């Protein structure tokens, strides 16, 4: 069967159209299984509006409560007087709870501890017949014991006990009040205590700044005494505390402990005693007033039934005298006394103000002799090889002469302490002799350039002499 060409053209386009219609790209594809499962999960896990509203309300409540907490903490803080009343009426349990928030306490420096007042127990005014107890070592105070007072809370302890305590704590062992004042921005500038700490190395550079700060504070409040040294603690008159300075300032010492006595400052002292809280007050007081052997026996038991009770009925005071500031200024670290401070005159006119200056001049003169000897010996390497042996021997003789003369000079100086004129003449003669010795040694020793020229000239002569000998 024969088909015409036109029929063939009509058949082939139909086949192409059917093939295009049945092609896999034109057929619709089903989505994969993972996409269908994720779409179903999104539809099922959609948050309802009620839950979203509850979350928003809770977040707003937490935000408002945080703002109220900050306002109460920073705007409604108690005043300094209320804080002092709180520390005065604080109980042992409250003090222990407060100590939990000061676990990272690293103590205070020994220089700060040394500035606290020290006195004898027998110097306290108003003592009763029975002795008080130390809250640190749990022992009774004796008449010859040295006590150290904390001016901020007026509590006193054994000197060794409180010193050991303060090296690892910056709070009082009884009331847990901090010895270092809170210098935050929200505190009243006219608070009862002011503490200024500076290192000893920076004292010379900050002394002027401390004086300016003290002048400004005195102008603001005449009742407050401000310390201008590198460590100062200023207290209120209610606690009997005044200025405590270290370094160049005054220190509180008892009149029996300090050598030079200055003004006497009264302090109020708060002491207590361990009493049994299980028994009645009268019976406990009678037991506590007994001999020390019974007290030592009961201290061996648990401290759960005993409490350190402050004696609020009696008013205890102690008068601590301040040590006078010495007229002589202490030398700063790394500072050495200059000859001008001892009255030294380079023209030869010496001034003496005491045995100390004589001793300093003597040491300076001996040091000068040693420096001249070392200067002359250090020029040995400048000498030539031919003259090395002879000049070294002569140099040793001259150094021996200079050292012996230096020893004679110091001997004459020690014998002539009471004759300044003779010592001045001997010192001038010794200086002239040393200058002449040094000048003579320098003239004998050629310069470096001259020795270099001589060495080159000698080498050239040697070369010429060797060439002439070979020619012969």
Swiss-Prot record:
Gene giving rise to this polypeptide: ATL13
Keywords tagged on the record: Membrane, Metal-binding, Transferase, Transmembrane, Transmembrane helix, Ubl conjugation pathway, Zinc, Zinc-finger
GO cellular component assignments: plasma membrane
Subcellular location: Membrane
Domain free text: The RING-type zinc finger domain mediates binding to an E2 ubiquitin-conjugating enzyme.
Transmembrane segment boundaries: 51-71
Family: Belongs to the RING-type zinc finger family. ATL subfamily.
A biological-process GO annotation: protein ubiquitination
Membrane-protein topology: Single-pass membrane protein
Organism: Arabidopsis thaliana (Mouse-ear cress)
The keyword Membrane belongs to this UniProt entry's keyword annotation: yes
PANTHER family listed in its UniProt record: E3 UBIQUITIN-PROTEIN LIGASE RNF13-LIKE, RING-H2 FINGER PROTEIN ATL13-RELATED
Enzyme Commission designation: 2.3.2.27
Protein name in UniProt: RING-H2 finger protein ATL13
Positions annotated as zinc finger (RING-type): 134-176
Pathway(s) of this molecule: Protein modification; protein ubiquitination
Catalyzed reactions per annotation: S-ubiquitinyl-[E2 ubiquitin-conjugating enzyme]-L-cysteine + [acceptor protein]-L-lysine = [E2 ubiquitin-conjugating enzyme]-L-cysteine + N(6)-ubiquitinyl-[acceptor protein]-L-lysine
CDD domains found in the cross-reference section: RING-H2_EL5-like
Domain of life, per lineage: Eukaryota
UniProt enzyme class: transferase
Region named Disordered: 320-340
Primary localization: membrane
């Amino acid at each position: 069967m024969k088909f015409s060409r036109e029929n063939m053209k009509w058949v082939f386009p139909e086949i192409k159209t059917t093939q295009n219609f049945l092609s896999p790209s034109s057929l619709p594809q089903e989505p994969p299984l993972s996409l269908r499962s994720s779409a179903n999960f999104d539809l099922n896990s959609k948050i309802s509006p009620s839950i979203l509203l509850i979350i928003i309300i809770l977040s707003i409540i937490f935000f408002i409560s945080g703002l109220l907490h900050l306002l109460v903490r920073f705007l409604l803080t108690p005043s300094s007087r209320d804080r002092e009343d709180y520390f005065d009426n604080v109980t042992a349990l409250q003090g222990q709870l407060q100590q939990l928030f000061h676990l990272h306490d690293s103590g205070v420096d020994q220089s700060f501890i040394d500035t606290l007042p020290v006195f004898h127990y027998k110097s306290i005014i108003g003592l009763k017949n029975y002795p008080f107890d130390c809250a640190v070592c749990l022992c009774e105070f004796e008449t010859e014991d040295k006590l150290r007072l904390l001016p901020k809370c007026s509590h006193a302890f054994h000197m060794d006990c409180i010193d050991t305590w303060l090296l690892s704590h910056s709070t009082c062992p009884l009331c847990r009040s901090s010895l270092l004042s809170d210098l935050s921005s929200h505190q009243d500038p006219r608070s009862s205590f002011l503490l200024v700490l500076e290192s000893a190395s920076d004292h010379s550079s900050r002394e002027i700044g401390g004086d300016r700060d003290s002048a400004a504070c005195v102008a603001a409040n005449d009742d407050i005494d401000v310390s201008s040294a590198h460590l100062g603690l200023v207290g209120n008159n209610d606690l009997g505390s005044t200025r405590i300075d270290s370094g160049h300032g005054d220190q509180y010492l008892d009149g029996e402990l300090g050598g030079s006595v200055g003004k006497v400052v009264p302090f109020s002292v708060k002491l207590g005693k361990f009493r049994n809280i299980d028994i009645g007050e009268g019976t406990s007081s009678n037991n506590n007033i007994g001999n020390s052997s019974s007290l030592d026996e009961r201290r061996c038991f648990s401290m759960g039934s005993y409490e350190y009770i402050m004696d609020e009925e009696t008013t205890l005071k102690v008068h601590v005298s301040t040590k006078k500031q010495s007229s002589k200024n202490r030398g700063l670290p790394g500072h050495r006394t200059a000859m001008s401070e001892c009255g030294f005159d380079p023209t030869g006119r010496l001034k003496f103000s005491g045995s100390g200056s004589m001793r300093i001049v003597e040491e300076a003169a001996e040091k000068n002799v040693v420096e001249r000897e070392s200067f002359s010996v250090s020029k040995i390497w400048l000498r030539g090889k031919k003259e090395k042996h002879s000049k070294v021997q002569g140099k040793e003789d001259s150094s021996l002469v200079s050292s012996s003369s230096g020893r004679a000079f110091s001997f004459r100086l020690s014998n002539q302490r009471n004759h300044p004129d003779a010592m001045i003449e001997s010192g001038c003669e010794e200086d002239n002799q040393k200058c002449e010795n040094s000048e003579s040694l320098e003239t004998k020793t050629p310069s470096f350039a001259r020795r270099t020229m001589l060495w080159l000239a000698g080498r050239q002569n040697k070369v010429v002499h060797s060439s002439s000998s070979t020619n012969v």
